[in-house]
UniProtKB/Swiss-Prot annotation:
The keyword Nucleus does not apply. This is Protein VirB6. The chain crosses the membrane at residues 35-55, 68-88, 167-187, 201-221, 226-246, 251-271. InterPro entries: Conjugal_tfr_TrbL/VirB6. Its main location: membrane. Keywords: Crown gall tumor, Membrane, Plasmid, Transmembrane, Transmembrane helix. One of its GO terms (cellular component) is membrane. The lineage of its organism: Bacteria, Pseudomonadati, Pseudomonadota, Alphaproteobacteria, Hyphomicrobiales. Belongs to the TrbL/VirB6 family. VirB proteins are suggested to act at the bacterial surface and there play an important role in directing T-DNA transfer to plant cells. GO terms for biological process: protein secretion by the type IV secretion system. Pfam families: TrbL (PF04610).
Length: 295
């Protein structure tokens, strides 16, 4: 029996997107319910204490009011599910993608990338099957060369798809843990964690912009050239020439794939997020511990 998926990229994208969306939405609601009651109680007590200290003159009035406003805004986002969705989730899942779509350099909607990859996959599958039927069962050299060209081509498609799909899924994961991370913004010691979380979301937003500008152009160019190149390859005189043509096709797709694979590093460097390498050096850590010792 031959089990095949007619549109593998679209099917995989739909399955993972639905699974993560359902699970993470449930987890987000659970997190907000768990932290809302103790957080509101602690913040209420903290505001009362702040008011007493301000009235006694032990805390600067302007600074105390600023802290109260900041804490109130953070708590409103963390506790209120509608507020968090309207002001945080919708910005990164709806507003930014819709805004970025207006700057597409190819006119190809980013959401159609799985369908474009499915079309290219189907076209090459037909060509691969025709060429495979011409190779004799005892011709080990041609079989090995053909399989190598086939797997390289599949690898280029899957790597481009993996980057595209990972951006959406990881953004959903970050947004799901947002209430816990934003709670840390209230405290000075954990404020850096919340800042890094925001930086990571900004990085994914930049990566989405780069994908929309670069990946759509690359994939549209590859889809346009693929039909012509497959026609030339299948009309070649010998099987060896067809296999060589497949490797030339791989080189073309690897060039475009290199541009797409480089996009996460570019977005990380621009966004200045934690995973892009913004870690402390050994000298920086040494200076920090030295300051602690002197105190």
């Amino acid at each position: 029996m031959n089990f095949t998926i007619p549109a593998p990229f679209t099917a995989i994208h739909t399955i993972f997107d639905l699974a993560f969306t359902t699970s993470l939405d449930t987890m987000l609601g659970t997190i907000q319910e768990a932290v809302s009651a103790p957080l509101v109680a602690c913040v209420t007590l903290w505001i009362i204490v702040q008011g007493i200290l301000v009235m006694r003159g032990e805390i600067d009035t302007r600074g105390g009011i600023t802290r109260v406003i900041t804490v109130t805004v953070v708590v409103a986002l963390v506790v209120g599910q509608a507020n968090y969705h309207d002001y945080v989730v919708s910005v990164f899942e709806e507003t930014i993608p819709n805004f970025i779509q207006q700057f597409s350099g190819s006119g190809l909607p980013l959401q159609t990338i799985p369908a474009q990859l499915d079309t290219m996959f189907a076209l090459t599958q037909a060509a691969f099957q025709r060429i495979a039927s011409e190779i004799g069962p005892m011709n080990d050299q041609d079989i090995l060369a053909f399989q190598g060209a086939q797997w390289v081509f599949y690898g280029t498609l899957w790597s481009a798809f993996g980057i595209y799909d990972a951006v959406g899924i990881l953004t959903k994961v970050l947004l799901a843990i947002g209430p816990l991370i934003l709670t840390g913004y209230i405290f000075d010691r954990t404020r850096d964690i919340a800042a890094k979380w925001i930086g990571q979301l900004i990085t994914y937003g930049l990566l989405l912009l780069l994908l929309n500008l670069v990946a759509t152009i690359v994939i549209l160019t590859e889809a346009t050239a693929l039909t012509l190149m497959l026609g030339v390859i299948t009309l070649a005189g010998t099987t060896a020439a067809k296999i060589i043509g497949l490797y030339e096709l791989d080189m073309f797709f690897l060039t475009g794939d290199a541009l797409i694979v480089a996009l996460p590093a570019i977005a990380g460097n621009i966004g200045g997020s934690y995973w892009s390498g913004a870690t402390q050096s050994a000298n920086s850590l040494y200076r920090r511990f030295a300051q602690v010792d002197r105190r």
